[in-house]
């Protein structure tokens, strides 16, 4: 009788254990599937943003990029909806920052303004800040391109945005809650200082060339 009770109890345990085992297997299988989808979409967004940034540098057509920006923003919203497990939230960082960087470059180049955080309510606060830090390096590329074309007005316009972004970035010193904040501040400072030096040299050369041109005109009129 005692053995029979034990046997019945063991069978019941096995039934319960199998039910729980099936649940746990399904739970982890679903979690792994979500993780794979997040990683795939994250890589896709990052790749799209990198390609978009390269194209923005080379183009003067504002309307060319609107559809792609909207497409990427929808992908990010989908990515956000997938990150239902707390441990997956970290996967949002890179794609969100890359999007902020691409959108900021676009708006600075074509609209002469920086996107506000309120406009990007699907972007985490930390990623908005770090994305703006990254665009400083892209603005340096625009400064250098403007120098090649002797466009002093554009050089000064882009550099002013670089300064404004750096000042904005330096308002934050929450290094224990925002990963890479200090590193990006240091990188931004270095880019700003290097670009300032390049601009000083550019203006000096521009003035020298203008002076030589006036001298040549004067000599030709004698």
From Swiss-Prot:
The record, for Pfam families, names: Translin
Instruction: Note the InterPro entries from the entry.
Output: Translin_fam, Translin_sf
GO (cellular component) term, any one:
cytoplasm
GO MF annotations, alphabetized: RNA binding; sequence-specific DNA binding
Task: Please state what the protein is called.
Answer: Uncharacterized protein MJ0175
Q: Native species of this protein?
A: Methanocaldococcus jannaschii (strain ATCC 43067 / DSM 2661 / JAL-1 / JCM 10045 / NBRC 100440)
């Amino acid at each position: 009788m005692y053995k029979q009770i034990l046997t019945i109890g063991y069978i019941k345990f096995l039934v319960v254990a199998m039910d729980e085992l099936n649940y746990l297997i399904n739970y982890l299988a679903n979690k792994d599937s979500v993780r794979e989808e997040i990683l795939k979409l994250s890589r896709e967004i990052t790749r799209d943003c990198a390609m978009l940034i390269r194209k923005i540098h080379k183009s003067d057509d504002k309307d060319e990029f609107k559809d792609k920006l909207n497409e990427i923003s929808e992908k990010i919203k989908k990515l956000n909806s997938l990150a239902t497990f707390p441990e997956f939230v970290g996967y949002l960082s890179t794609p969100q920052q890359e999007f902020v960087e691409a959108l900021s470059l676009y708006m600075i180049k074509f609209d002469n303004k920086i996107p506000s955080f309120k406009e990007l309510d699907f972007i985490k606060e930390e990623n908005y800040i770090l994305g703006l830090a990254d665009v400083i390096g892209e603005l340096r590329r625009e400064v250098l391109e403007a120098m090649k074309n002797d466009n002093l007005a554009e050089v000064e316009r882009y550099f002013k945005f670089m300064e404004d972004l750096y000042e904005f970035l330096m308002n934050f010193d929450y290094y224990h809650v925002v990963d890479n904040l200090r590193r990006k501040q240091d990188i931004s400072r270095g880019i700003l200082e290097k670009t300032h030096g390049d601009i000083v040299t550019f203006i000096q050369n521009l003035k020298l060339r203008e002076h030589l041109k006036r001298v040549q005109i004067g000599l030709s009129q004698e």
